[in-house]
C-alpha cells in the first residue's frame, strides 16, 4: 500500500493568512492528506476560519473547503486533527497559561459563538471529539510528545538529556513520531543526535529543505543495515514560529522522507487582525514579525 503524500501542520493559532499560504502550497506540491497536530486556536484573531478548514480537511472523509481556491484532482486521503494544549484549555480551564495566552483563550471561547448557534455547536462538537494522539502504519502523531501528547515540550536542549530522551521514546510503537507545541522545527534521534533545519543557504528557492530520508525502523524500504535510530520530528509552527524565523513552517512526509517547508506569508495582515481585537494583547501581533 502506497503511503499518501502527507502535509503535517501544527500550531496554526488562528492565523488565517499563514494557514491559507501553507494549505495552498501543500496542494501545489501534491499533498493528498492533511494531519494537524493541534493548537488550531489561541493567540490569533481568526479561530473560526481555521477551525472551518480543519473540520473539512483534517477529518476521516475530507473535502476541499469552498472558500479555499486550489487546483486538485482525485480524492483526498483520510486526515487527522489532534488536540493541542490550547484546545484542551478552551474545553476546560487554562492551566499554566500566561496572562496573554489566557486572554486569547477567553476571547476565543466567546468568538466561537459569533457564527451562529448551529455553527457554534459544530465547533464545540469537533473540539470535543479531538484525540490526544494518533498513528498510522508508519508514524505516530502528537501535539506535545509521545510521553505526554498534549502538554510536554520537546526542545533542542533535550538532546543532551539521556534520561528525558529515553522517557520520550519509551512509549513509541512506530519508527517516527511527529510533534509540534514548541514551535521549533527539529529532528531528535533516539541516540541523542539532533538535526535542526536551517532553511536558508541549503534551501531551494521554493522554500523547501529536503527531502531527507528518516531511515528509521518501519519507514519505507530502507535496508536494515542502514536504518537509523527512531526519530521524533517537530514540524514547527504555521501560525506563530518561534525559532527566530517569521516564515511559517510545516513538513511533507511520503512515508520515508521528510521535507521542511518555510514560506513567507502576509505577516502584516495577520498582525493587523490581532490589533483590531481589543481583547487580544498587542504583543501577540508584534511577535509575529520577529519569529519569537
Name each model feature, range by range.
Residues 13-18, 42-45, 86-91, 147-149, ...:
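Active-site environment of divalent metal-dependent phosphoester hydrolases
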Residues 56-148, 152-173:
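Active-site neighborhood of divalent metal-dependent phosphoester bond hydrolases
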Residues 190-292:
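Acidic, His/Gly-rich catalytic cores of divalent-metal-dependent hydrolytic chemistry
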Residues 21-24, 49-52, 95-98, 155-156, ...:
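Short, glycine/charged-enriched secondary-structure capping and boundary segments
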Residues 2-6, 134-141, 226-232:
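Beta-strand-turn-beta hairpins that frame and shape the catalytic cleft
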